A protein has these predicted regions:
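Beta1-alpha1 glycine-rich phosphate/pyrophosphate-binding loop at the start
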Residues: 2-75, 164-217
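Glycine-rich, N-terminal phosphate-binding loop of Rossmann-like dinucleotide-binding domains
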Residues: 9, 92, 109-110, 153, ...
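A Rossmann-like FAD-binding core segment of flavoenzymes
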Residues: 28-31, 68-88, 100, 191-287, ...
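FAD-binding core/adjacent interface of flavoenzyme oxidoreductases
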Residues: 72-192, 196, 265
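FAD-site-proximal beta/loop scaffold in flavoenzymes
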Residues: 122-148, 155, 258-263, 267-324
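FAD-binding beta-loop-beta segment adjacent to the flavin cofactor pocket
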Residues: 288-305, 356-376
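A conserved FAD-binding loop/helix module that cradles the flavin
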Residues: 310-356
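C-terminal auxiliary extensions adjacent to catalytic cores
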Residues: 363-411
Length: 411
C-alpha cells in the first residue's frame, strides 16, 4: 500500500489527509504528524480573546477524529525532512527522536510565529494566533480599565521568492505582512468589547502596519473604506511601522518610532518552520518556503507536495488558500495512483470574514486584485456574521473535514 505522510494538522494538513483517504480509500495508508494533540479552529481565536468562546470549545481531538476516518495520528514535532531518502525525523512527546518513511509527502506544517524577533514579547506581547495566546489576551482584557491599545502586524520574513515555482508570476508576490485579516477583525471586536464593559471612552486605539498602509492585499477602494472606518472610530493609524520591541506602555519600531500601548495585540512575524534549517536545502526558496508547481508538487522532488502556509505560492497566508491547495494536491495524487480525478484549477483569492459577534455583523471580503483580477467585494452585513457562526459550527461538526468548502467559499 502507498504510504502518504502529512506534516501538520491545521487547515492544510487536515484537508490533505481527509481528501486523500476519501479519493483513494484502501489504496493509500495515511499518517498525519502534528505537534499538538488537537487541531484548533484558528479563525475563532479572536472570539476567544473577547470571551465569546473558550479555546477548548474550538479544538478537534486528532487522536479520535483521524482514526475514525482510517487515518493514523502521530503526536510529534517535525525536526527535519530528508527529501532524497524519503524520510522525516520528528521528536516524540518524551523527547525521543524517531524516523518515519514515506512514498509521498505533504508538507503542511505551516509557517512559524517568529516571536523571538520581538524584544519584550514574553512580558508585553499579546496575540490571537494560538489558543494559549488568545486565552491569555482575554485574561488581560478582563483586567483592563482603560488606557492605550495598539493593534497591528509584525514583519513577514518571506524572502524574495527565489527560486520561484512553476506557476503564473502574479500568483505570489512579496508581502509586508503574512495576513492582516486578524488585525482588521480585532479592530472591530475590541471596541465592541470595551463598549460592553463601559470603558471605550477611557481607551485610545492605534492601528499599525509594516506596510505602506493596512491590508495591501485587497483593492485600494476597500482599503479606503477601512481607513474611513478607523477615522470615524477615532483610531490613530501608523504605517511603515516595523515592530522591533515591546516595552511597558509602548511599542518600538526598527527605526525608533513609538506607539503608546498598555496592551499590544500583534500578529507576530511569520517565518519558515524551524524544521527547514535541518532539511534538504533545495526543497525550499530563500525564505524557507517550498517551491512547487500549480499542482503543489515540489519542482525538485515530485513525490513531495506542499500545501497551505508552507508553500511559496500561498500569499497571503490564508485558511482559504490552505484548503484549496490541499484539495488540488490530493486530486493530483489520486490521478498518479490510478484513480481518475478532476483536478481543480488554482484560482487564488483573498477570502475572509472579519466578524463582530458582540454587535452582530461582519465584513466579508472576496478580492482578487492582489493577483491581477478585478473582484473587490468588502460587504458588511448581519448575514455575514451568521455565515461566520455557521462556518465555525461546520468545522467543529466535521472535525475539520471541509469537503463542501469549495461550494461555500463565499463564507
Amino acid at each position: 500500500m502507498t504510504k502518504l505522510l502529512v506534516l501538520g494538522g491545521r487547515f492544510a494538513g487536515l484537508t490533505a489527509a481527509y481528501t486523500a483517504k476519501r479519493l483513494l480509500g484502501d489504496k493509500v495508508d495515511v499518517t498525519l504528524i502534528n505537534n499538538t494533540p488537537y487541531a484548533a479552529f484558528r479563525p475563532g481565536m479572536p472570539h476567544v480573546s473577547i470571551g465569546v468562546f473558550k479555546a477548548e470549545d474550538l479544538e478537534v481531538d486528532l487522536a479520535t477524529a483521524l482514526p475514525a476516518k482510517g487515518i493514523k495520528f502521530v503526536l510529534g514535532t517535525v525536526n527535519a525532512i530528508d527529501a532524497k531518502k524519503n524520510k522525516v525525523e520528528y521528536s516524540a512527546p518524551d523527547g525521543k527522536k524517531e524516523n518515519i518513511t514515506y512514498d509521498y509527502l505533504v508538507v503542511a506544517f505551516g509557517a512559524k510565529l517568529g516571536v523571538e524577533h520581538l524584544n519584550g514579547w514574553d512580558d508585553y506581547g499579546s496575540s490571537v494566533c494560538e489558543p494559549d495566546f488568545a486565552t491569555a489576551l482575554h485574561e488581560k482584557l478582563e483586567k483592563f480599565e482603560g488606557g492605550n491599545i495598539a493593534i497591528g502586524s509584525g514583519v513577514f520574513y518571506q524572502g524574495t521568492l527565489k527560486p520561484r515555482g512553476k506557476y503564473p508570476e502574479n500568483w505570489a508576490s512579496v508581502a509586508d505582512s503574512a495576513c492582516e485579516g486578524p488585525i482588521f477583525e480585532m479592530s472591530l471586536m475590541i471596541p465592541a468589547y470595551l463598549k460592553k464593559r463601559g470603558i471605550m471612552d477611557k481607551t485610545h486605539i492605534t492601528i499599525f502596519s509594516p506596510g505602506e498602509e493596512i491590508l495591501t492585499d485587497i483593492a485600494k477602494e476597500s482599503r479606503g473604506v477601512v481607513k474611513s472606518l478607523f477615522a470615524q472610530a477615532g483610531f490613530d493609524t501608523v504605517w511603515n511601522f516595523k515592530l522591533k520591541e515591546l516595552k511597558k506602555g509602548e511599542i518600538v519600531s526598527e527605526d525608533g518610532k513609538t506607539i503608546k500601548a498598555d496592551i499590544a495585540i500583534v500578529l507576530p512575524p511569520y517565518e519558515a518552520n524551524d524544521a527547514v534549517k535541518n532539511s534538504t536545502p533545495d526543497l525550499f526558496d530563500d525564505g524557507g518556503f517550498v517551491v512547487t508547481d500549480e499542482h503543489m508538487r515540489s519542482v525538485k522532488y515530485p513525490n513531495v507536495y506542499s500545501c497551505g502556509d508552507s508553500n511559496q505560492i500561498t500569499v497571503p497566508k490564508l485558511g482559504f488558500l490552505a484548503v484549496m491547495t490541499s484539495r488540488i494536491a490530493m486530486q493530483d495524487l489520486a490521478n498518479r495512483l490510478g484513480v481518475p480525478t478532476k483536478v481543480d484549477t488554482y484560482t487564488p483569492e483573498v477570502v475572509c470574514i472579519a466578524d463582530n459577534p458582540l454587535e452582530g455583523f461582519a465584513i466579508a471580503v472576496n478580492d482578487t486584485t492582489f493577483y491581477g483580477g478585478d473582484e473587490k467585494i468588502a460587504q458588511p452585513s448581519a448575514t455575514n456574521h451568521i455565515k461566520k457562526e455557521l462556518f465555525t459550527k461546520y468545522f467543529m461538526w466535521t472535525n475539520g473535514d471541509m469537503a463542501l468548502d469549495k461550494y461555500l467559499a463565499s463564507w
